[in-house]
Amino acid sequence: MATMSGTTIVCLIYLTTMLGNSQGVNLKIESPSPPTLCSVEGTFHCDDGMLQCVLMGSKCDGVSDCENGMDESVETCGCLQSEFQCNHTTCIDKILRCDRNDDCSNGLDERECDIYICPLGTHVKWHNHFCVPRDKQCDFLDDCGDNSDEKICERRECVATEFKCNNSQCVAFGNLCDGLVDCVDGSDEDQVACDSDKYFQCAEGSLIKKEFVCDGWVDCKLTFADELNCKLCDEDDFRCSDTRCIQKSNVCDGYCDCKTCDDEEVCANNTYGCPMDTKYMCRSIYGEPRCIDKDNVCNMINDCRDGNVGTDEYYCSNDSECKNFQAAMGFFYCPEERCLAKHLYCDLHPDCINGEDEQSCLAPPKCSQDEFQCHHGKCIPISKRCDSVHDCVDWSDEMNCENHQCAANMKSCLSGHCIEEHKWCNFHRECPDGSDEKDCDPRPVCEANQFRCKNGQCIDPLQVCVKGDKYDGCADQSHLINCSQHICLEGQFRCRKSFCINQTKVCDGTVDCLQGMWDENNCRYWCPHGQAICQCEGVTMDCTGQKLKEMPVQQMEEDLSKLMIGDNLLNLTSTTFSATYYDKVTYLDLSRNHLTEIPIYSFQNMWKLTHLNLADNNITSLKNGSLLGLSNLKQLHINGNKIETIEEDTFSSMIHLTVLDLSNQRLTHVYKNMFKGLKQITVLNISRNQINSIDNGAFNNLANVRLIDLSGNVIKDIGQKVFMGLPRLVELKTDSYRFCCLAPEGVKCSPKQDEFSSCEDLMSNHVLRVSIWVLGVIALVGNFVVIFWRVRDFRGGKVHSFLITNLAIGDFLMGVYLLIIATADTYYRGVYISHDENWKQSGLCQFAGFVSTFSSELSVLTLSTITLDRLICILFPLRRTRLGLRQAIIVMSCIWVLVFLLAVLPLLGFSYFENFYGRSGVCLALHVTPDRRPGWEYSVGVFILLNLLSFVLIASSYLWMFSVAKKTRSAVRTAESKNDNAMARRMTLIVMTDFCCWVPIIVLGFVSLAGARADDQVYAWIAVFVLPLNSATNPVIYTLSTAPFLGNVRKRANRFRKSFIHSFTGDTKHSYVDDGTTHSYCEKKSPYRQLELKRLRSLNSSPPMYYNTELHSDS
């Protein structure tokens, strides 16, 4: 025992030496110095109560020494150079000076404006000395207060279809009095405008000028009300049944000008086409083209009615130079002396009256038997002949259809044209002569929940005030009037104060809102004008991925404020965004442009910019001046660059910035006041850099920061006061809990504290701290005694003693592990957190983890081997199937190799394991939490599944042995129930110790695999107290409590007692000599002797099957 104690002391001294050589992360944690007395001269008072004072030299040094940050506050240190000081606690950006808004609570920022110089390049001083942004000039708003910024402006004249606001702004007439303000001054919605008798109210909700009523042009698109009951028609007019007068030239032109289409029902069959010899096809841009008489071309009357002039009056000027230039200069000369633009030549549309522009072209293709050839040469499927749809440009496919034979599922019009049978009498005019809607059955009676159209048609109420496809709703569109109070459903778009359309019809290239182009406003279009490089929509210009080397605009499109220039090759210079039209930009995306630097003054005029994206470039540094001018910037994303240095005062002017993303850079050092000026910052992300040191004062004056992300760095040197003066800090993300020890109390910090350690101690629980020493000493001493005791039997060839010796070696190593952890805890007491990372990555911790795994699994597999040996012995007592010593050595050698490999594999450098044993301060790799740390599957396989199988094997084997032994005794000696009870107790003790050790770990492991999390203290108790339990109890169960050991101890105690008595009496003649042949009375009567005699009698009188000694004597 003395030798053992000496060995233990030597080991502890060695461990202490190794621990002393480890270098911890320098957290600059100093011993707390006595507080500076506030009464001493030369100190600064942090608060009015004089509870904390610091040296005067610490004031305004960039490091918050006061817990409340008072030594670095505005009250103490004043404002930055780019700021204006309102009072002793408040600063504002200088750009807010003299802007007619009291940004200071005392109004100080709006005083003495007559001598204040406005920011050059971005603002202009007007007559009353206030500063107005350049883009606010001539914006129809009085920004100065005296309207001086709106007086010297060039305004355009409003056209006839526009309303002139009181401030001279022009808006479309369709927007007048629709409930939405379009004039900046709101004059389009005021009472004066809307109650005026200058306007005519259409049933669909829009207003038109009264001079547009009865002007021959329909402005009330749904009802034609502005053109009804106007006058008696002239001789050159045609009168519709609804009283509208139209030009006779528009009768039978293929377009319904009358609401009831009267003008197209009086036509002869031969007028359903547009033959070139007598007719002229209008080149209509909107809707169905008209076919007019040739005599109406160039007659100075708009007969095509497809614009203010009409395409029939285009190219009518007799240009004397037309013959000379002809096609060479871009013209084609018609015989009727009309000059056509070159692109109209051979375009399959005759523009010359007799079609000369289409005669000298390529020969028309030859059509197949299944095709019909139009007169101008185009081939169309024969099935489209006479189907009431104009497929040929000259409508020749719908001519001469009187004798046309319709298909089986079609119905023939009086004109011979064919329409589908289900379209007959459907309230829609399908036949060119309207015969499909004549002689129809009486109109049906509408049901109570249906809506009746003016034409008698019944429709579903859900179709009311919804403009759908051609056959949705009323054919006469009466369901679309009086819809000003209708509420659109989800997925619908409201046409201002009128009906609704499906959202899919918005920005589809077709105007569906009849009163205005509301559904086609703010749609995506190609820009800049005439270049088609980018796509614009609303205020956004998207030039992403166009390989641009310079900005594509020389003059910014009106109202564009969001520029997306990402994924290009832009060459950024100090003048790239210097033009005045960039000062209204609020969002700028320059990501993925291969930028290597940001020249100073690059954004000096972009004071309205709120979002700047510089991510994923090759920027290596940020210079002082690179971000100058971005005083209103709120979010800066510069992640994914190669930034190594950030110059001082780089962010000093960005006082409104709230989000700064500097992740994925190459920063190595965060110096004092690096983020000076970021007073409104709430999120600071400097994760995934190469930061190894952070100075005190690095986050100075970030009074509003709520989240700081430091994860993904290799920080080795960090100031103790680095997180002081951050009163609103809510969350801190790091890679190690040691940094959380510096954060203010109440901050949510990750990663979480491990289950064992605190900022001060490796073992934070005092009970566990004592337990680990107790269990370690018991396991070490107890198993050493067992090894010493069993070696004599091993030399005698006893297999069982050999196995017990292996078990004791495994448990002895567990004691070594416990004492390593206990010694480390003692050594690091009070300063553990500064050595946390280095300890967990140290070779000693890795060795401790190896020893714990090796010990645990060696014990488990050895117990399983012992159990199987006993089971075979009980089940087959007559066979010589027990392990011999040689076989036992082979088995245990295999087990030693296996557990060695299991324990050493995580130390071989595989990336899968990643500090497998250093996941906690006690160097254990147990997986009993939901965290999926590297190597967790391996941990589950070794500590959960393997141990579960071993426990099931041991428990079931002992139950089987007890059952067999009990039946044997019942058959032979029913009187020996006492021995049965003793055997049952020993078996129960063996199984229950295994149960208490392994089952909690196994259960907790499976619970964690299901995603549940137990209390951290549960894990700590199981890992430190429960896991080593078997190592402390196995020596007692398998050796120290057995009859041979107890008998030997008693015998030696008697020897010692007799020797001690004889030494006092002086009688040495009868001293005890153990020669193996003589036996003293004490020995003969000793309990050990009685047990031996009892065992021999049992063997002589019992059947050979009963072999109980190995179960409860364990000799």
Curated annotation (Swiss-Prot):
The record's GO molecular-function terms, alphabetically, read:
G protein-coupled peptide receptor activity
| Disulphide linkage map | 38-53, 46-66, 60-77, 79-91, 86-104, 98-113, 118-131, 138-153, 158-170, 165-183, 177-194, 202-220, 214-230, 233-245, 240-258, 252-267, 274-291, 282-304, 298-316, 322-339, 334-352, 346-361, 367-379, 374-392, 386-401, 406-418, 413-431, 425-440, 446-458, 453-474, 465-483, 488-500, 495-513, 507-523
Q: Does the keyword Membrane apply?
A: yes
Annotated glycan sites: 87, 166, 269, 318, 482, 502, 571, 618, 624, 685
Question: LDL-receptor class A domain spans which residues?
Answer: 36-79, 77-115, 116-155, 156-196, 195-232, 231-269, 272-318, 320-363, 365-403, 404-442, 444-485, 486-525
- Residue spans, topological domain Extracellular: 25-767, 823-857, 909-941, 1010-1017
Instruction: Give the tissue specificity.
Output: Predominantly expressed in a small number of neurons within the central nervous system and to a lesser extent in the heart.
Keywords for this entry? Cell membrane, Disulfide bond, G-protein coupled receptor, Glycoprotein, Leucine-rich repeat, Membrane, Receptor, Repeat, Signal, Transducer, Transmembrane, Transmembrane helix
Instruction: Report the CDD domains cross-referenced here.
Output: 7tmA_Relaxin_R, LDLa
Q: Which residues form the LRRNT domain?
A: 518-562
Leader sequence residues: 1-24
Q: Which residue ranges traverse the bilayer? A: 768-788, 802-822, 858-878, 888-908, 942-962, 989-1009, 1018-1038
Q: How does it sit in the membrane?
A: Multi-pass membrane protein
Instruction: Give the record's GO biological process terms.
Output: adenylate cyclase-activating G protein-coupled receptor signaling pathway; hormone-mediated signaling pathway
- Pfam families given for it? 7tm_1, Ldl_recept_a, LRR_1, LRR_8
Cytoplasmic face of the membrane: 789-801, 879-887, 963-988, 1039-1115
User: What cellular component terms from Gene Ontology apply here?
Assistant: plasma membrane
Q: Which family does it belong to?
A: Belongs to the G-protein coupled receptor 1 family.
Annotated protein name in UniProt: G-protein coupled receptor GRL101
Q: Which organism is it from?
A: Lymnaea stagnalis (Great pond snail)
